[in-house]
Swiss-Prot record:
Its EC number is 3.1.26.4. Belongs to the RNase HII family. Gene3D superfamilies: Ribonuclease H-like superfamily/Ribonuclease H. It comes from Mesorhizobium japonicum (strain LMG 29417 / CECT 9101 / MAFF 303099). HAMAP family: RNase_HII_B. It is an enzyme of class 3 (hydrolase). It catalyses: Endonucleolytic cleavage to 5'-phosphomonoester. This is Ribonuclease HII. It is found in: Cytoplasm. GO terms for molecular function: manganese ion binding; RNA binding; RNA-DNA hybrid ribonuclease activity. Endonuclease that specifically degrades the RNA of RNA-DNA hybrids. A divalent metal cation binds at residues 38-39, 130. Its cofactor is Mn(2+); Mg(2+). GO terms for cellular component: cytoplasm; ribonuclease H2 complex.
Length: 231
């Protein structure tokens, strides 16, 4: 239980943690394996959207699984390794900025999740997707869970894998395009990123030129210290 910031000392905020209840019920219904799916990178101005699909081992679930946005960088990195070492199957997929521009971010996110699921080494009987939409074309039954990364441990694991992989990809972009600071803001619309775009222009095939800032000439700036709360 976490204390909420308030003028009243008696006000508390209960922070719900994801559990394995959705997966356990599916197992009881004969729907196993169950995969969790999530993506990272819907909001940035640059870089890919990355998705992951994870089938956890019910007998070996890493402690501390949570929505990746509620974890620190170091917590995500540690859990990433534990997930890879304990899960029954893990798969990742990405859609490039060009692919996003060629459709839209929602379609690209759903397609990345579908590709990640198809890439699993086991064939799940049920896929749990974070959000409101089930990706079309899944090879199994699918269920969308709003705030699923805060409700299902399988989805939480997928959110961590997707976030860590995307951050690593953006750090690689930063080493190739050192004037933009991708390794700091991960492609989000921070003041530093906006200034770099205004000074040097967008990077071909890396910036999402279909996004409003490039079409309309402006966007809300995201402060770099707030990036921990973004996917």
């Amino acid at each position: 239980m976490a204390r909420a910031r308030s003028d009243s000392p008696l006000l508390f905020e209960i922070v719900e943690k994801p559990d394995f209840s959705f997966e356990t019920k599916a197992m009881a219904d004969g729907l196993w394996p169950v995969a969790g799916m999530d993506e990272a990178g819907r909001g940035p101005l640059a870089g890919p959207v990355v998705a992951a699909a994870v089938v956890l081992d019910p007998a070996n679930i890493p402690e501390g699984l949570d929505d990746s946005k509620r974890l620190s960088h170091f917590q995500r990195e540690a859990l990433f390794l534990r997930i890879l070492g304990s899960a029954q199957a893990v798969s990742m997929a990405s859609i490039s900025a060009e692919g996003i521009d060629g459709s839209n971010i929602l379609k690209a996110s759903l397609e990345a999740m579908r590709r990640a699921l198809v890439g699993l080494s086991v064939r799940p009987k049920l896929a749990l997707a974070d959000g409101r939409d089930v990706p079309p074309g899944l090879p199994c039954d699918g269920r969308a869970l709003i705030k699923g990364d805060q409700r299902s441990q399988s989805i939480a694991a997928a959110s961590i894998v997707a976030k860590v992989m995307r951050d690593r990809m953006m750090c690689g972009c930063g080493s190739h395009h050192d004037r933009y600071g991708f390794e700091v803001h991960m492609g989000y619309a921070t003041a530093r990123h906006r200034t770099a775009i205004e000074t040097h222009g967008p990077v071909a095939r890396l910036h999402r030129v279909s996004f409003a800032p490039f079409r309309l000439g402006g966007t809300e700036v995201v402060e770099e210290e707030s990036l921990a709360g973004l996917d």
